[in-house]
Amino acid sequence: MSTYDGKKIVITGGSSGIGLTAARLFADGGARVLITGRTRSTLDAALEQLGDKAVAVRSDAANLKDIEALADTVAEHFGGVDALFVNAGVTASAPFDSTTEEMYDALFGINTKGPYFTVQALAPLLHEGSGVVLTTSVVNVLGLDALSVYSASKAALRSMTRTLARELLPRKVRVNAVSPGPIDTGVLDRSLPADVVETMKDTYRSTNPMQRLGMSEEVAAAVAYLAFGATFSTGTEFPVDGGASQL
């Protein structure tokens, strides 16, 4: 019997990066996985990797109508849910004095508002004993230039983890967060010139206590632990950051 045989898992932001790696881990272990993303072509490419036990839903993580529709789709396909990984999010940087209202609203919309209402919409489908995992960030506890809004949106999510853990405790649903540090997801390679990417990676490596970048697989392993293995943990944040938040 495979590790996750019969489990039903929903992953927002599951079409690439950490979300897709986690989806692969669960699908390879026998779970049925439903992933979301904003781009149909990216979702279709993810499905090719995940196989016939996966479902892909185009959904805007900050749009309440899409979130409500997602809950209906999950109910139709799965009935109930054993684990919810709320991973959809965006990163943007700008100095404090040039940050716009549009940027502020976009980051809080996807990184904070979206996860809140996603958990609210899917909570009725969560089985007793299930796990919710939210993706925060090492920037919750670090003061970094040009990341004031992004940091705040993720810090709010960290606080939300505690409160949702308390509110869902009577239903025996655990809520925890995974906090990635500098992770090599391939996103930089696909979006920036190679020389720029290598300079950025060198900086991340040199400033990290472990002198390297993390891998998506390392974050996915932490997600799996929080979703299923951490049966006596709720309201906590699990760092996968090479010691950046502690050393």
Where are these regions (language model features)?
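Substrate-binding pocket helix/loop in short-chain dehydrogenase/reductase
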Residues: 95-96, 100-108, 204
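Conserved glycine-rich cofactor-binding loop
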Residues: 15-17
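Active-site helix of classical SDR
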Residues: 119, 153, 161
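Short, small/polar-rich loop/turn modules that mediate ligand/substrate recognition or access, typified
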Residues: 85, 169, 174, 234-235
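Alpha-helical segment proximal to the catalytic Tyr-Lys
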Residues: 124, 166-170
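C-terminal substrate-recognition "lid" of short-chain dehydrogenase/reductases
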Residues: 125, 212-240
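Short C-terminal tail/terminal secondary-structure segment
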Residues: 142, 234-247
